[in-house]
Structures are given as C-alpha cells and as structure tokens.
C-alpha cells in the first residue's frame, strides 16, 4: 500500500468562484490570524494568474497598489493583507505569477535542463508551481518550519489562466495526502431583491466546476450581504457534498478586522484544526479584542485628506489608508478619509475648497507628471496655514520642490516631470539614468526593498521613532539633488535623515518653530504598519492632526517666508507620544 510522505506542514488552498472581488485575500488573512492566535506558525502565499512577471509596471487603476516586501519584491496588494493580519514580514516568494513561472520554465528549457523533453503545461508548468508552493514549507531564517501554509489562488474557477494553478494544487494534495491538504472555496450567494430570495445555484455550479478538475472543497465560504439561513446552508452542504460544519456564512462585516470574529463564530478555525489534525489550543483574543475596541469605540474623529492621482480606486492606496487608520487606533480615534484628486489643488481656490475642512494632508507616492502641481499646491496651502502634512516617497519630493520655490527657485522641479528645468532639485539616481533613458528594462529595476537611514537626534522623526537608526522599504528612481541642499534649507526645511553615508536624503521636516508638522520620507513606511502595531510616523501624523483639530496647533494663516526664508512661530508642538514597541 502506497504511503504518503510524512509532512509536518499542512497546506490550505483558498479558491474563488462565481465572481471576483469576493474577499478571498481577506478571508485567507483572517483565517491565518485565527490560526496564529491559536499558537500555530502560519505563512501565506498568493498565486496570481496574470502573465506579468510582477505588478510593478501595471496601472494602479487596474491592479491597485504594489506592495513591496523587505527583500524588494513588488507583489500583489493581498500580500499586504497577509502581513498586517499575521503581523510578520513575508518575502518575495509569497507572490507567484504566471509570468514568473513561464519565464523560469522557458529559461530552463534554453539551458537544456529538460533533456530534450517536449515542454508542456503538464508536467513542466505545474511542477514549477508545485515547487514554489512546497518551498513555502521550508524552515525560515530562524529555523522554524511553518505549521500551515495558506495559499490563495487568484482569479475565479473557470478562468483559463487559473487552470494550471488549480491543477498544481490538486497534485499537491495527491502527493502529500488528503489528511495534509485542505481546500477552502469562497463563493457568492446573491440576494434577489424582487423575489426576496437568496440563490444557491451559482455556488452549486461553481463547486461543480471545481470538482470537474478533480478538487472537492473541504469547506465553503458563502459571501453575502446578510446571514445565510441554516436551511440554505444544509441545502448547499447536500448539493455540494460538503460537511455541514464546513459551510460558513460570512455576511458583510462593519470592518475588515471583524472578519476573524465572523469566521470564529462559524467555527471555521476549529474545523480546519480538526480536519488537518493540528494541535488544538484556544484562540488568544487579548490583542485582537483590544484592536476591535479601538476600531468600534473611538473617542473622536479626525479628517485626513489623501491628495493623489488614483483616488477613484481606493485600492491604489490600500496600505496608506490602513496605516492611517492604525495611527488613529493608537489614539483611540477614527480617521475619516477625504479623497482629493490632486488636480483639484492646482489653484489656491481649489486647494482651499478641497482642504478647508480637513485636519491633515497626506501626499502619497506615485509616478508621472499628471497631478504634480496639485500636490505641490496642496503642500503650499498646508504650509501657509499650519496644517499637518505627511509626504511619502513622491510626497517628500513635492515637499522639497515647494520649499525650493519658496526659497526663490521659481522654476524648481523634478527631472522626472521636466527634464529641462533650470533647477532640478529632484534628480535621477545615478544607477537609474540608463533605465530612464530606455536603455534597460523598467520592470523590477527601481531602488526596492529595505534600506537603513540615520536620523538627526533632535528631529521630529527621531522623536517619533524613538531611535536614530531605522530601516524602511523603498520604491523609487529619483532622489533629492544634493547640489541644492543648502539653497533649499533657506526655506527652513531640514534634512533630518539620510542614508548611512549621508548621500541620499531619506527624511525632511520643518522645525516646530517654522511649522507644526510637515514631514516627508523617501520611503514607504505604510508597508510596515500593522493594525496592532501602527507605524510611528503615522502615529505622530495623526496625533498632529488631532492637535490641529483641538486648536493646540492653531489653524491660523502663517505668513510667507521673509527674505531669509524662515518664519518662526511662538507656539511649540505638543510632544509626540511614544508609539508601541516595534520589532
């Protein structure tokens, strides 16, 4: 009798049916959080069926944000959900695309590694996918082997692009044994208002399509805008041949952070533990319950304007908005997002109309010239009125451009937006010149991943972090032109953090006697924020916005700089509260 290999790691696959955007990523993340709260070591992976090697060159309107990992991989935004819910860093191996798989297989064929075989989807493509799935079960850098690997399969069952991934998942179950693999299928149960009925037929057809390729789901997540009654759950269990304990109703939740509670109420985590024969421990809700109290019982509300190019699609700034909300959780405050198209702030009147009722302005990252003058206009409006500002990546560059113009360089600009500008205060990084000129590939060639920075001891950012040695993730090709540092400093702007060699500007800020809170970073700190451990910069920024709202940082018009570029204030900013300890 054939025996399956002994495996210490269990694999759980999450697929989707009927429609896209049902929340597979959040479902997988929430289940991962529940298993982690049971004391298990969980890691996660996303299989994306598109032919792009990574999402780095994709339009944010089509794909949403690009989430950058510590090791510099440009990945799907769901990887951000995984990191936030698991509260641990993942690597580039957490995201696998069809483009990566085919590129690797074709490269192997060119090297002659297939010994003359005809290269086919089965077995060569599926074997490459299986290898990447099984690699997630290897011990981490500390030697710890995961108890569970949760793998989300992108797309919808029935899509041509997803078929190799589903076949690879089926083969993993065949190779490791059914007792070591669990299939979770997320499906839509639509409500028809005219008849007042919930319809189960789409889910039945979706499961039938899954079974036709050899996969029988162990559990079903029923997505609906309301609870699915027990009678319908029994019907679905019968028609789809799934245990009734594995039919899970997941109505829309008030917050994404409520989803673990929804799944736990339906006992999905206990069912998974039982089916995979995992160690049984009670869920430790201590940290998550504290988070939910902060989410649902805020003491006040603060309005933050996000001035960006892609505000029509909130997923384009997903990590930013979650980091802002987490900063609010720290202060027991609700952050109300005000989405402002950067084009609306190009004129003084437009900026006043868009920003007149907010308590803080966030300028996120981005690329291209469209909307840049609006971002600069928003910064000018905020600077002259004492309104707190946090600039991320491109946001730092816009703060620098606005400061340079205030210091007398009227034509100051970035080489990205105006190659012929007389004062390129933002210039192309030396190792990016050929790439920008078109002499090398654009994809995967930016300054990516975690880099260290050194902060000045008495700076706002050092007080926020509680240290002068920090590491943040990056994604950029342009930098502050060091030839203009002295001139820009005449505006009062301070270069408060640099790379360890002092060459690359990583942080800028105005001292509190010049402006209450304008801070910019060349990094993307939002990528390291967690709902239970908010990032220090977002804690400080939301705190400054709350001060502004309370009138402690007076929302009065600040005069333009004098001839020496510096305008002092009599009042000082409130000390920045110490954020929770970060690992």
From Swiss-Prot:
User: CDD domains in the record, alphabetically?
Assistant: CTPS_N (cd03113), GATase1_CTP_Synthase (cd01746)
Q: Where is this region: Amidoligase domain?
A: 1-278
**How would you summarize its activity regulation?**
Allosterically activated by GTP, when glutamine is the substrate; GTP has no effect on the reaction when ammonia is the substrate. The allosteric effector GTP functions by stabilizing the protein conformation that binds the tetrahedral intermediate(s) formed during glutamine hydrolysis. Inhibited by the product CTP, via allosteric rather than competitive inhibition.
Where in the chain are disulfide-linked cysteines found? none
Which GO BP terms apply? 'de novo' CTP biosynthetic process; pyrimidine nucleobase biosynthetic process
Active-site residues are: 393, 524, 526
Q: Which reaction does it catalyse?
A: UTP + L-glutamine + ATP + H2O = CTP + L-glutamate + ADP + phosphate + 2 H(+); L-glutamine + H2O = L-glutamate + NH4(+); UTP + NH4(+) + ATP = CTP + ADP + phosphate + 2 H(+)
User: Keyword set for this entry?
Assistant: ATP-binding, Glutamine amidotransferase, Ligase, Magnesium, Metal-binding, Nucleotide-binding, Pyrimidine biosynthesis
Drop me one GO molecular function for this one.
metal ion binding
Question: What quaternary arrangement does the UniProt entry report?
Answer: Homotetramer.
**To which protein family does this belong?**
Belongs to the CTP synthase family.
Sorted alphabetically, which NCBIfam families does this protein's record hold? PRK05380.1, PyrG
What name is this protein filed under? CTP synthase
């Amino acid at each position: 009798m054939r025996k399956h290999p002994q495996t210490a790691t269990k694999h759980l696959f999450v697929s989707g049916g009927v429609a896209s955007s049902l929340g597979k990523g959040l479902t997988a993340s929430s289940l991962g959080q529940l298993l982690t709260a049971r004391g298990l070591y969980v890691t996660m992976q996303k299989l994306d069926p598109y032919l792009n090697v990574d999402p780095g060159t994709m339009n944010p309107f089509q794909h949403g944000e690009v989430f950058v990992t510590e090791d510099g991989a440009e990945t799907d935004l769901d990887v951000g959900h995984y990191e936030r819910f698991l509260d641990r860093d993942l690597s580039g191996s957490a995201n696998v695309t069809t483009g990566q798989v085919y590129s690797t297989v074709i490269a192997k064929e060119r090297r002659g590694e297939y010994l003359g075989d005809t290269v086919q989807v089965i077995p060569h493509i599926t074997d490459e996918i299986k290898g990447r799935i099984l690699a997630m079960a290897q011990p981490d850098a500390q030697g710890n082997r995961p108890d569970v690997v949760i793998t989300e399969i992108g797309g919808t069952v029935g899509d041509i692009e997803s078929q190799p991934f589903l076949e690879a998942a089926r083969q993993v179950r065949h190779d490791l044994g059914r007792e070591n693999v669990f299939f979770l299928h997320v499906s839509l149960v639509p409500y028809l208002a005219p008849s007042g009925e919930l319809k189960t037929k789409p889910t039945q057809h979706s499961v039938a399509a899954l079974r036709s390729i050899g996969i029988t789901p162990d559990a079903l997540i029923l997505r609906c805008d309301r609870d699915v009654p027990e009678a319908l759950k029994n019907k679905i269990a019968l028609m789809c041949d799934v245990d009734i304990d594995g039919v899970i109703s997941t109505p829309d939740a008030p917050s994404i952070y409520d989803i673990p509670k929804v799944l736990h109420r339906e006992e999905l985590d206990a069912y998974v533990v039982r089916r995979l024969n995992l160690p049984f421990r009670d869920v430790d809700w201590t940290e998550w319950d504290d988070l939910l109290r902060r989410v649902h019982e805020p003491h006040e509300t603060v309005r933050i304007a996000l001035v960006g190019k892609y505000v029509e699609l909130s997923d384009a700034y997903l990590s930013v908005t979650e980091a802002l909300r987490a900063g609010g959780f720290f202060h027991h405050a609700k952050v109300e997002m005000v989405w402002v198209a950067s084009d609306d702030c190009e004129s003084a009147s437009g900026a006043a109309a868009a920003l007149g009722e907010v308590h803080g302005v966030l300028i996120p990252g981005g690329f291209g010239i469209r909307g840049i003058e609006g971002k600069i206009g928003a910064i000018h409006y905020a600077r002259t009125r004492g309104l707190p500002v946090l600039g991320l990546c491109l946001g730092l560059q816009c703060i620098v451009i606005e400061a340079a113009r205030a210091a007398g360089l009227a034509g100051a600009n970035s080489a990205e937006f105006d190659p012929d500008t007389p004062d390129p205060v933002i210039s192309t990084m030396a190792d990016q010149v050929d790439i920008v000129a078109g002499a090398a590939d654009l994809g995967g060639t930016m300054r990516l991943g975690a880099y260290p920075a050194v902060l000045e001891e008495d700076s706002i950012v050092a007080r926020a972090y509680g240290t002068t040695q920090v590491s943040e993730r990056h994604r950029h090709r342009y930098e502050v032109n060091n030839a203009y540092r002295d001139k820009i400093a005449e505006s009062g702007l301070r270069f408060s953090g640099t790379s360890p060699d002092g060459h690359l500007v990583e942080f800028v800020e105005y001292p509190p006697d010049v402006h209450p809170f304008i801070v910019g970073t060349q990094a993307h700190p939002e990528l390291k924020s967690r709902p239970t451990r908010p990032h220090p910069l977002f804690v400080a920024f939301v705190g400054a916005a709350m001060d502004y709202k309370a009138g402690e940082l007076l929302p009065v018009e600040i005069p333009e700089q004098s001839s020496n570029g510096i305008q002092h204030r009599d009042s000082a900013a409130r000390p920045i509260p110490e954020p929770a300890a970060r690992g």
